[in-house]
Curated annotation (Swiss-Prot):
Keyword Membrane: no
Catalytic activity, as annotated: adenine + H2O + H(+) = hypoxanthine + NH4(+)
Cofactor: Mn(2+)
EC number: 3.5.4.2
GO molecular function: adenine deaminase activity
Gene3D superfamilies: Metal-dependent hydrolases (3.20.20.140), Urease, subunit C, domain 1 (2.30.40.10)
Similarity comment: Belongs to the metallo-dependent hydrolases superfamily. Adenine deaminase family.
Gene name in the database record: ade
PANTHER family membership: ADENINE DEAMINASE, N-ACETYLGLUCOSAMINE-6-PHOSPHATE DEACETYLASE
Gene Ontology terms describing biological process: adenine catabolic process
Protein name (record): Adenine deaminase
UniProt cross-references to Pfam families, sorted A to Z: Adenine_deam_C, Amidohydro_1
CDD domains: AdeC (cd01295)
Taxonomic superkingdom: Bacteria
Organism expressing this protein natively: Geobacillus kaustophilus (strain HTA426)
Length: 577
């Protein structure tokens, strides 16, 4: 440490040459939101000066802008379907040099083993992966996940410097009623002087007071400007989300003004690999914000300095002395065209491709991570939804590109005393199969997929990650579920009993050890198959499907135990009285 500090101070004082000097660049100063000029001197991965410097090596920025590396403030890496080592190869070319990850997807399947897997995998990449420990495994007290994590099981992870705090507290009833297990986790984080993230989906100002009283300081679930302002006024940071399903950015931008802008940052939350590759990570958030009229320097500040300060990362988020040499070369601030990405002063990506060798995931994985689909085969008779008193039913209505759903009560087709899917009315059967211990099957009705044939199934079903399937007929539904059993999880599209496309995800039914290029190819085949059964392409059916089982986001969801009214916080029958 002393030798590093000595070398850095000596170079800053121009007593010795810097390791690297970046010349002819326009530095984006996120403290003052201005462009400044000068050489950038770097020693042992840290910026030591801006001015006139000599270096052992020089790089000509050729007049480009030099921006801080971008920070994704909240992401579930598992949603990319690849582990951190491959995830990094996709997001680094997009200028993302730091992420704040919540590994609660794999934790819901494999418990502490899943968290440790993600921490170990994160060491295989130059990307800085910080973790927030899952606070709600399972997501709600009645959920039957693959694990239940207590404060005692989480405590040892706080010894890892990459663990910044407690991840999104989404079980509001347990928080409001001061459930002992919830208080234990909050106290664990507070006593360790760590941060606590929130999850205030659909909650009002009174609930914000409850969250703030619990020392919870962020929310990424705002969908209206009023919600965002309620949180900021009470001292929270608001993460503006733009993911594969939840696309809240344009709606929230009106909440930002000169006096409150430092309380906003960006996140992706959940984003599929193909969306990350072709569209981008939080660089996409920045571009959208600029296109919508936000000052480019403010948008960059939100994606860098604001995020670093929110998560107490004092050496991240700026191009300035004393900060890590994580920076980007950008051709144009309006389009944020990123040409080069540097991590700790080393080039890691250039013109959309990484320039460091890939490191494969560990070949040997612990048993809880493999063969995690443990349910029995499902028969068509298991999928019968009785309708004994008429044709009225409670129906989940999808809102395209939103996590929320509508709760409908509508007429459905009934044959021989049971619900019959209707392609004409876009009323399909929805199935959730408990996959960790084979405990049961939940059945419901969903509107909005628009399929004309077939069925789809996935072992990605937030947050307990049971098998979830939607389809036009029972034959294809059972075939889709069986395909996932055989391939140990993943995605499948079925038509007329045949597999049109599938993507095995052998790590907990959530991720694969395959190269990201193979996953992109597999997702392309999935998209082709979805079109063959009638998907119109206006939203991602699989990501939408994956959130239909999450009973902490309103209004109506389906779990393995049945239909759940989130607003009333109770299970209800499918048939409406």
């Amino acid at each position: 440490m002393h030798s590093t500090l000595h070398n850095q101070i000596a170079a800053a004082a121009k007593q010795t040459k810097a390791d690297l000097v970046i010349q002819n660049g326009k530095i984006v100063n996120v403290f003052t939101r201005e462009i400044i000029e000068g050489d950038l001197a770097i020693v042992e991965g840290m910026i030591v000066g801006i001015g006139r410097y000599e270096g052992e090596k020089t790089i000509d920025a050729e007049g480009r802008y030099i921006c801080p590396g971008l920070i994704d403030g909240h992401v579930h890496i598992e949603s990319s379907m690849v582990p951190p080592s491959e995830f990094a190869r996709v997001v680094l070319p997009h200028g993302v040099t730091t992420v704040i990850a919540d590994p609660h997807e794999i934790a819901n399947v494999a418990g502490v083993c899943g968290i440790q897997f993600m921490l170990d995998e994160a060491k295989r990449t130059p990307l800085d992966v910080y973790m927030m420990l899952p606070s709600c495994v399972p997501a709600a007290s009645f959920e039957r996940a693959g694990a239940v994590l207590s404060a005692a099981e989480l405590a040892p992870f706080f010894n890892d410097e990459r663990v910044l705090g407690l991840a999104e507290v989404m079980d509001y009833p347990s928080l409001r009623e001061q459930h002992p297990s919830m208080l234990d986790k909050l106290a664990l984080a507070a006593n360790a002087n760590r941060l606590i993230d929130g999850h205030l989906a659909g909650l009002d100002a009174d609930a914000v007071n409850v969250y703030r009283s619990a020392r919870i300081h962020t929310d990424h679930e705002c969908v209206t400007p009023d919600e965002a302002l309620e949180r900021v006024r009470r001292g929270m940071y608001v993460l503006i989300r733009q993911g594969s399903v939840a696309k809240d950015l344009k709606k929230l931008l009106p909440a930002i003004h000169e006096h409150n802008a430092r309380r906003f940052l960006f996140c992706t939350d959940d984003k599929h690999l193909d969306d990350l590759w072709f569209e981008g990570s939080v660089d996409h958030n920045v571009r959208l914000a600029i296109q919508a009229g936000l000052d480019p320097l403010l948008a960059i500040q939100m994606a860098t300095l604001n995020a670093a300060e929110c998560y107490r990362l004092p050496t991240k988020g700026a191009v300035a002395p004393g900060y890590d040499a994580d920076f980007l070369f950008v051709d144009d601030l309006e389009t944020l065209n990123i040409t080069h990405v540097f991590k700790a002063g080393r080039l890691v990506a250039q013109h959309g491709q990484t320039v460091f060798p890939a490191e494969r995931s560990a070949e040997s994985l612990e048993q809880p991570l493999l063969h995690s689909i443990r349910c029995q085969a499902v028969d068509e008779t298991d999928l019968r939804i009785p309708m004994k008193r008429g044709t009225k039913a409670h129906v989940i209505e999808i809102i395209p590109n939103h996590l929320h759903t509508n709760h409908l009560i509508t007429d459905v087709d009934v044959q021989e005393g049971a619900f019959c899917p209707s392609i004409e009315r876009d009323l399909l059967k929805l199935v959730v199969v408990e996959r960790h211990r084979g405990l049961g099957i939940g059945l419901g009705i969903v509107r909005g997929f628009g399929f004309k044939a077939g069925a789809i199934a996935s072992s990605i079903a937030h947050d307990s990650h049971h098998i979830i399937a939607a389809g036009t007929n029972d034959r294809d539904l059972t075939a889709a579920i069986e395909q996932l059993r055989q391939q140990h999880g993943g995605l499948a599209v079925i038509k007329d009993g045949a597999v049109l496309a599938s993507l095995p995800l052998e790590i907990g039914g959530l991720m694969t050890r395959k190269d990201y290029t193979e996953v992109l190819s597999g997702l392309k085949q999935i998209d082709k198959a979805l079109k063959a059964i009638g998907a119109n392409g206006s939203f991602n059916p699989f990501i939408t499907l994956s959130f239909l089982a999450l009973p902490v986001i309103p209004e109506l969801k389906l779990t393995d135990q049945g239909l759940f009214d989130v607003n009333k916080w109770e299970f209800i029958p499918v048939e409406a009285v």
